[in-house]
Swiss-Prot record:
Active site per UniProt: E9
Enzyme superclass (EC): hydrolase
Residue span of region Disordered: 136-156
Protein name (record): Zinc metalloproteinase-disintegrin jararin
InterPro entries hit by this protein: Disintegrin_CS, Disintegrin_dom, Disintegrin_dom_sf, MetalloPept_cat_dom_sf, Peptidase_M12B
Record organism: Bothrops jararaca (Jararaca)
């Protein structure tokens, strides 16, 4: 019951309104129901999911942006799965790394590799310039590879 109420209040913090009578989640009660039920739900309704998705796209699209390496304030640590300043790549500890483009012990690219990951990286090589790496939404144009990086830049 406590977890259900916490999920409900978190929903409000994320900008989700209480469900209307027409909302459905495939259960007797949904997380964002305006009334408390004896049978707490673990599901958000179609209305809640639509509202959250719409708000995320229309108002909080920046949350979908990948952080820059320079945004991280802790010292770089090779083996944490996140490429930080000074690392070319980071595929985790050597025992777990499954990326042939990345040397897990050094967090540097393997010999002959141009990239280790990203929408513009294919088999350790940069995808040629002008290839679409992310379709545009709304008025935003398609994002295209530069041919100089494995990352897909935002062409907004």
């Amino acid at each position: 019951f406590v977890a259900n109420r916490m999920a409900h209040e978190l929903g409000h913090n994320l900008g989700i309104d209480n469900d209307r009578d027409s909302c459905s989640c495939g259960a007797n009660s949904c997380i964002m129901s305006a009334t408390v039920s004896n049978e707490p739900s673990s599901r958000f309704s179609d209305c809640s999911l639509n509202q959250y998705s719409s708000d995320l796209i229309n108002y909080y699209g920046c949350l979908l942006n990948e952080p820059l390496r320079t945004d991280i304030v802790s010292p770089p640590f090779c083996g944490n799965y996140y490429p930080e300043v000074g690392e070319d790549c980071d595929c985790g500890p050597p025992a777990n790394c499954q990326n042939p483009c990345c040397d897990a012990a050094t967090c540097k690219l393997t010999t002959g590799s141009q990239c280790a990951e990203g929408l513009c990286c294919d088999q350790c090589k940069f995808i040629k310039a002008r290839q679409i790496c992310r379709k545009g939404r709304g008025d935003n144009p398609d994002d295209r590879c530069t041919g100089q990086s494995g990352d897909c830049p935002r062409n907004s």
